[in-house]
Amino acid sequence: VSGVMKLVNINKSQYRSVNNQVQIGLVATLAILSVILGQLMIYFFGVKPLPGAEATGNFHLNFTGVILALMVCVFLIRNLRSKPKFYEVYYVWQLKQLQNKIYRKLKSIQLAAKDNNRDALVILSFYYQSLALVYELDNNTLTISNVNNELDKLQKCIDAAGISVDADEFTPDMLQAF
């Protein structure tokens, strides 16, 4: 994820519908292609079973079928992610990746925010608002109150410092300082 990452309003029902379709489609594609490709590998390169004999040792061919199926799924994802129908699912996926990058540096960002470091405050503002967005989309009602509490605490800190902070100012490059 590079460049500017803005928080976007997402149609929850559309996102969930397309996300479910993508997940089910990928699992089904992976399962079906794994079996088909594994069987094709065994047919062309495998050891033929003898009546009453032990296993043929074609595990490596089945495994190769799974790897090939996984490669097909990755190819599909890479080509479909830019399609308008998949925009929201891909956006949320990128947002979750970015949240993970921020989370790995969260302690040092929070320390800098206590010293009113403006970039740290912008990062935290983006982080908590993006968490609230994703939790809402994923129906994660258990932890959204914690995120809202963190947002409230952050806003009080920003107000006390007399600083103006907007989550839209966030860029992933800001993380390099932490």
Describe the function of each predicted region.
Residues 25-45:
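Canonical alpha-helical transmembrane segments of integral membrane proteins
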Residues 2-22:
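Cytosolic juxtamembrane N-terminal segments of multi-pass membrane proteins
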Residues 41-59:
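Membrane-interfacial hairpin junctions
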Residues 145-178:
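Cytosol-/stroma-facing membrane-proximal "stalk/adaptor" domains immediately downstream
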Residues 91-107:
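Membrane-cytosol interface motif
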Residues 103-137:
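Acidic, Ser/Thr-rich low-complexity segments on the non-lumenal side of membrane proteins
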